[in-house]
């Protein structure tokens, strides 16, 4: 085996894609010292998006102070490219799940306000083009936090201004954009989303993703009702129906919530990443693609990173093996086209133990070593 491409997404809440790829590379080097290894850390719009794009485009990294999902001060960074014209912003850096301890997660109370502050900072620096990766969030506020930070006001039936959090979507009665940052009129946004889910419903933002953000079943229902209500308010104010738009449910509804108010378009995050980084050119002469993410399940085939990698692998006739911290629906994943799908856990552990960064890296290294040892026996 002469060439292996490592194209891992982040193991959300545990280890980023760069560190995962380094652990896999170490295992391959020990077993196949003459093999060419190409580390290609990727992202689908969530964690690692800024890192992957900024690395490929040699971006300038800038920092700013914003607010986290619970409105606590935090320092974040983002990339600027194209001679200062474009900002590459990762939503997860301001309101991602890893910023909140698992026992404190509550999408009823979290906000995307900090993302809006990042955009405002970039506007001040002269940026007018934006790529915003919107996966991996701890929020379900449909982007009203971000819009509030940019000047939008959300009012209840008594004209009181609402706090921009998930539980208040159901209370939105009026939307006031009269104070929206004027620089937005000359700005363009590419919203890189990691899923194709609609805004609400059984496959929407609340039902599919809110539980992993800490929501109880009752809260899921309340959030979904809020999204339904807010979609209707948006339609009344802008004449845009975002209810069943593919990707509108990404990042707690942020995918759809931004389109009516910004010069924005939704694109598959993985397509943005792979095209920018010219992934297909790298894969053409490879013998194997190793990929993976924290959890492999039915969502893996819904426009997420591994689905995009698999499509390129199939096009170039290169086998794709996927590793996951947890694996569900193995047969369905095999039918999607993966050569093999493997869990990395060596024995039963608690979720908290499984998410420990060092434990995850050790498991990746051990699993990749076993995969390579098997391959060696059949390629002698």
Label for each model-derived stretch:
Residues 2-134, 138-380:
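N-terminal loops that bind phosphate or other acidic moieties
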């Amino acid at each position: 085996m002469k060439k292996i491409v490592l194209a891992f997404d982040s193991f959300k809440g545990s280890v980023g894609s760069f560190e995962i790829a380094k652990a896999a590379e170490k295992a391959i080097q020990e077993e196949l010292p003459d093999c060419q290894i190409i580390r290609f850390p990727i992202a689908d719009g969530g964690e690692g998006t800024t890192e992957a794009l900024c690395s490929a485009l040699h971006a300038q990294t800038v920092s700013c102070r914003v607010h986290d999902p619970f409105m606590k001060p935090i320092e974040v960074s983002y990339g600027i490219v194209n001679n200062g014209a474009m900002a590459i912003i990762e939503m997860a850096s301001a309101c991602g799940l890893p910023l909140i301890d698992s026992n404190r997660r509550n999408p009823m109370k979290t906000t995307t306000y900090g993302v809006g502050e990042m955009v405002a900072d970039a506007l001040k620096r002269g940026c007018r083009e934006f790529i915003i990766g919107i996966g991996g969030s701890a929020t379900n506020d449909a982007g009203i936090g971000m819009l509030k930070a940019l000047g939008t006001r959300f009012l209840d039936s008594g004209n009181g201004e609402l706090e921009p959090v998930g539980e208040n979507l159901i209370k939105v009665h009026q939307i006031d954009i009269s104070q929206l940052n004027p620089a937005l009129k000359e700005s363009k946004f590419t919203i890189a989303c990691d899923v194709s889910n609609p805004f609400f419903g059984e496959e929407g933002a609340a039902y599919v993703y809110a539980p992993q953000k800490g929501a109880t079943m009752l809260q899921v229902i309340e959030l979904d009702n809020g999204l339904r209500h807010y979609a209707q308010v948006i339609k009344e104010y802008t004449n845009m129906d975002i209810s069943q738009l593919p990707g509108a449910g990404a990042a707690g509804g942020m995918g759809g919530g931004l389109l009516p108010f910004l010069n924005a378009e939704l694109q598959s995050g993985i397509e943005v990443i792979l095209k920018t980084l010219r992934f297909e050119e790298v894969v053409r002469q490879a013998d194997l693609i190793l990929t993976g993410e924290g959890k492999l399940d039915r969502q893996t085939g819904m426009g997420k990173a591994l689905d995009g990698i698999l499509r390129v692998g199939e096009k170039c006739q290169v086998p794709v093996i996927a590793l996951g911290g947890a694996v569900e629906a193995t047969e369905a994943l095999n039918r999607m086209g993966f050569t093999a799908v493997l869990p990395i856990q060596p024995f039963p552990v608690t979720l908290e133990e499984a998410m420990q960064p060092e434990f995850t890296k050790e498991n990746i290294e051990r699993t990749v070593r076993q995969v390579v040892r098997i391959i060696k026996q059949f390629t002698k």
